[in-house]
Design a protein with these regions (language model features):
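Extended, low-polarity segments enriched in aliphatic/aromatic residues
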Residues: 2-193
Length: 193
């Protein structure tokens, strides 16, 4: 499978929210408006007590045109809007997946690249012209991740940050297999995360 969040971890989180916190499944939305949720994940995370949990991805995400993202740095790119599933939410849980990445370590920060909509449905961050800012390793360099985390609707509503590090892909877009899930760098030294 491609490097999506582990459906077992997502399902466990959802069961905890419904079974222990008493949140109604229909009041829960899992979203990433830059990707597609695989059918197996949606099915696994909406069965039994989770029936009614919503999934919003690039096919059904709706831009809240009253909520454009205001970047603190001026650059050219598409206007970006938060999805209505974010602006209508009372709070967020940021569940990201650990994986190797050519842009360096971002953990939960880059997860919000799945939190905005613009004219490029396939790759909103490219439509926004954001990747250019992630390749620089210099101090005092602008990072759009800071703006996303500081956004009142994103960072301001986030009550929990979680990182799925159970079985991780070695890079973005890589399939997770027995061979690729073993990380070569320290401290893993050819073992699993």
């Amino acid at each position: 499978q491609m490097s999506y969040t582990n459906p077992v971890l997502l399902k466990t989180l959802l069961i905890s929210l419904v079974g222990e916190a008493g949140i109604l499944p229909e009041d829960i939305t899992a979203y990433d408006v830059s990707r597609l949720f695989p059918d197996y994940m949606v099915e696994m995370c909406t069965e039994e007590i989770l029936e009614g949990v919503h999934f919003v991805d690039r096919r059904n995400g709706i831009a809240d045109e009253n909520m454009p993202i205001n970047w603190s740095y001026e650059f050219s790119g598409a206007v970006n809007y938060l999805p209505t599933c974010v602006t209508e939410a009372e709070y967020l849980i940021n569940l990201a997946n650990l994986k190797g990445h050519s842009y360096g370590i971002t953990l939960c920060g880059k997860n919000h690249f799945g939190s905005f909509i613009n004219g490029n449905a396939m790759r909103p961050p490219e439509g926004a012209n954001l990747h250019q800012f992630l390749t620089k390793n210099e101090m005092d360099t602008y990072s759009p991740l800071t703006d996303l985390m500081a956004n009142e609707q994103l960072g301001g509503k986030t009550v929990l940050y979680m990182l799925d590090a159970l079985i991780c892909a070695p890079s973005e877009g890589a399939s997770i297999t027995e061979e690729t899930a073993r990380w070569r760098q320290m401290p893993f030294d050819g073992s699993y995360t």
